[in-house]
Design a protein with these regions (language model features):
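Bacterial Sec-dependent N-terminal signal peptides
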Residues: 1-31
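Charge-rich (acidic/polar
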Residues: 26-140
């Protein structure tokens, strides 16, 4: 009886692991690469902000440069076996601040205001709050 219970538990665990791996692999295969993500974001911003073609080009170029650069910094942290999630967040914040600064130069005032209303203002405030907290923590 005990062996049947152990066997059932082992089979259930094995099934769960295989199902999880299958789901993870399917999600990995379905997820677009970084350049496709940049294109999708540029297309989304074109629809939402009614961007002109030259603006879409600059947004796309910015994202295709900055996304891989951010990922390269993540990879450096991973290779250095950095486990501090704050450091990863700092890298992300740095690159998103840079992207927003570029967007501000590309967008008209109306487009920028719409972009901020779409959630960017909240994200910027959160990044500024984290930065202030980190700087305040260094002074202690």
């Amino acid at each position: 009886m005990k062996s049947n219970i152990c066997l059932m538990a082992a089979l259930t665990s094995l099934f769960a692991i295989l199902a999880f791996n299958g789901t993870a692999n399917a999600q990995q295969q379905e997820q677009p690469d970084i350049y496709e993500q940049a294109e999708m974001e540029a297309d989304r911003l074109q629809r939402v902000l009614d961007l002109e073609d030259w603006q879409v080009f600059y947004v796309d170029s910015t994202l295709k440069h900055d996304f891989p650069a951010m990922m390269a910094e993540y990879e450096q942290l991973r290779n250095a076996k950095v486990g501090n999630t704050v450091m990863y967040q700092d890298v992300r914040d740095k690159w998103l601040d840079q992207i927003d600064a570029t967007y501000k130069r590309i967008f008209t005032e109306e487009q920028w205001a719409t972009y901020l209303k779409q959630g960017a203002a909240k994200a910027q405030k959160a990044r500024a709050k984290r930065k202030a907290k980190a700087q305040g923590g260094d002074k202690k």
